UniProtKB/Swiss-Prot annotation:
SMART domains: Proteasome_A_N (SM00948). The keyword Thylakoid does not apply. It comes from Oryza sativa subsp. indica (Rice). It is found in: Cytoplasm; Nucleus. SUPFAM superfamilies: N-terminal nucleophile aminohydrolases (Ntn hydrolases). The 26S proteasome consists of a 20S proteasome core and two 19S regulatory subunits. The 20S proteasome core is composed of 28 subunits that are arranged in four stacked rings, resulting in a barrel-shaped structure. The two end rings are each formed by seven alpha subunits, and the two central rings are each formed by seven beta subunits. The catalytic chamber with the active sites is on the inside of the barrel. It comes from the Eukaryota. One of its GO terms (biological process) is ubiquitin-dependent protein catabolic process. Belongs to the peptidase T1A family. This is Proteasome subunit alpha type-4-1. InterPro entries: Ntn_hydrolases_N, Proteasome_alpha, Proteasome_alpha-type, Proteasome_asu_N, Proteasome_sua/b. GO terms for cellular component: cytoplasm; nucleus; proteasome core complex, alpha-subunit complex.
Amino acid sequence: MSRRYDSRTTIFSPEGRLYQVEYAMEAIGNAGSALGVLAADGVVLVGEKKVTSKLLQTSRSAEKMYKIDSHLACAVAGIMSDANILLNTARLHAQRYALSYQEPIPVEQLVQSLCDTKQGYTQFGGLRPFGVSFLFAGWDKHHGFQLYMSDPSGNYSGWKAAAVGANSQAAQSMLKQDYRDGMTREEAVALALKVLSKTMDSTSLTAEKLELAEVFLQPGTGEVQYQVCSPEAMGKLLAKAGLSQPAPEA
């Protein structure tokens, strides 16, 4: 039945479904997992790298975590070429707002603007939906720390803890069970690593398979800080959480 209605994004099925949008969400389900946890003093993002071959030369740049503005970052799950287009669009929105109003763009306003773009690709002929989901982490003076999730349909919503990518339903269930209000960033990191260790396809967690980023306020100055965890620091975090063995000393 679906084959009659899935050739174009502008055609609803008799059940009221847009199959191309659903197929885009299926593409995200095959991507590496990404988690976001909202803490009292920041937001934590953790992502799983998909290393397809040991011959692949991994770049120094991030694969799952991206900075959009000084107060806003995101984790990505899905088709990276699609994500790059949307990331550039988001950065352009942020810079235009800063140029016009001389202050950082509110987090939800940027998320809504980007989701309007994504929604447009589900409504007009000759286009296909973006096969990517985002977890946005940021801070602004209006609502403090915030975590948003968006999908290919253009929908977005605010979350205390969220997961996208492979095994996201299992991860979401664990987050719902173990999350509590008022967590510190350190506790949020431990929770995210614990959930990822139980839902990843890989048998064991290693620093090379993970990316971790945090958005928090710098002590003293109160400025928003975006920080990416180094592989060395990631290894120590995994060892501290009891999720991997520390490397033997030479």
